Design a protein with these regions (language model features):
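Substrate-engagement module of ASCE P-loop NTPases
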Residues: 145-164, 189-196
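Phosphate-binding/switch loop-helix module in NTP-utilizing enzymes
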Residues: 97-156
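P-loop (Walker A) phosphate-binding loop of NTP-binding proteins
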Residues: 19
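Conserved small/polar residues in nucleotide/adenosyl-binding loops
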Residues: 214-218
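Conserved glycine(s) of the Walker
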Residues: 23
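Phosphate-binding P-loop
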Residues: 5-10
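Cytosolic-facing regulatory segments adjacent to core modules
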Residues: 2-3, 26, 30, 34-118, ...
């Protein structure tokens, strides 16, 4: 991925889009962890869907190479404990700040990030859950709101001079096609997102649809 996009560049708005279940959050957390470890800067993660505890568990699972469900259920093997201890030591040395307030606007995030010294990366999970500056007045055109927020995210990336990775949901349009691979036209609720983003990346797993097809045929 680094070779394809030439790494994470300052002031870039990077859109990471996929259908639910493709691994957007896990991918973004891995990027966040790698940045925090490699450049020793603070990574701000705004999670509008999952709690701080859920994300912390995922980070620990990823670093320890222990299945997430084992951590959540406590069904750990004896060999897992040493891995977890080592991963916890590493995570304790990096500065990843998770804010799980589900009602944050772009302006709120910008203000919080400005108070962080040595900021290296911002991750937002995810665009369609964000609140507009007006607080979501009734009668608002959601497509216009999302378009406005994507523009504000680009402005934020430039003002903070750090890369901003924003996760986004896709519409169901790809599921109606024989070729399930996502396209720019599948971006949900906004035709302007691809104009504001410097990079648009899609996550796609062919086995996800093959598995569903096999199940339905059975």
């Amino acid at each position: 991925v680094d070779m394809a996009i030439s790494g994470l560049n300052k002031s870039d708005l990077i859109l990471l889009a996929a259908r639910p279940g493709m691994g957007k959050t896990s991918f973004a957390l891995n990027v966040a962890l790698n940045v925090a470890k490699a450049v020793h800067k603070t990574v701000a993660v705004f999670s509008l869907e999952m709690s701080r505890e859920q994300l912390a568990t995922r980070l620990l699972s990823s670093e320890a190479c222990v299945e997430n469900y084992r951590l959540k259920t406590g069904s750990l093997r004896e060999t897992d404990w040493e891995k977890i201890a080592g991963a916890a030591t590493i995570l304790n040395k990096v500065d990843i700040r998770i804010d799980d307030n589900p009602m944050l606007s772009v302006a709120d995030m910008n203000a919080k990030c400005r108070r962080i010294d040595s900021l290296g990366l911002v991750v937002i999970d995810y665009l369609q859950l964000m609140t507009s500056a007006s607080g979501g007045r009734s009668g608002e055109n959601r497509q216009q709101v999302v378009s406005e927020m994507s523009r504000m995210l680009k402005v934020m990336a430039k003002e903070l001079n750090v890369p901003v990775i924003c996760l986004s949901q896709l519409s169901r349009a790809n599921e109606k096609r024989d070729d399930k691979r996502p396209m720019l036209s599948d971006l949900r609720e906004s035709g302007a997102i691809e104009q504001d983003a410097d990079i648009v990346m899609f996550l796609y797993r062919d086995d996800y649809y093959n598995c569903l097809l096999y199940t339905s045929d059975a």
